[in-house]
Amino acid sequence: MARRLSKELGEKGHVIVSGLARGVDTAAHAAALKTGTIAAMASGVDVIYPAENTVLGEEIGRDGGLRISEAPMGMSPQARHFPQRNRIISGLSRAVVVVEAAARSGSLITARTALDQGRDPPATHLRPTCA
């Protein structure tokens, strides 16, 4: 669902903003490489986390996307940086779409932040079958 939604939104001119995390974030960024994606990071922009997304992170930076962070260069991600990253994701976004989220997840922090910033996240009761 994340791949399809990101591809379709990108083709309509929207830039996909996500956190370069495993799963849904990875699928969303990969689907939007050709149309525009921004990776908000919990580490310095030169420290791609998780390591398994190194190639994707490099592609984002090389292919016209953007990696951004409030953390200084060289800084590894720390637990306190993830809510800050989620605030950036929400702040850059016209709408926040949560495709899948655990009860205690960054996705729900991002959705709550969007509400605090005056935006209503779109909701669906569809069950995604895969990222």
Task: Name what the model sees in each region.
Residues 1-131:
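Glycine-biased, small-residue-rich flexible motifs in mid-sequence functional cores and linkers
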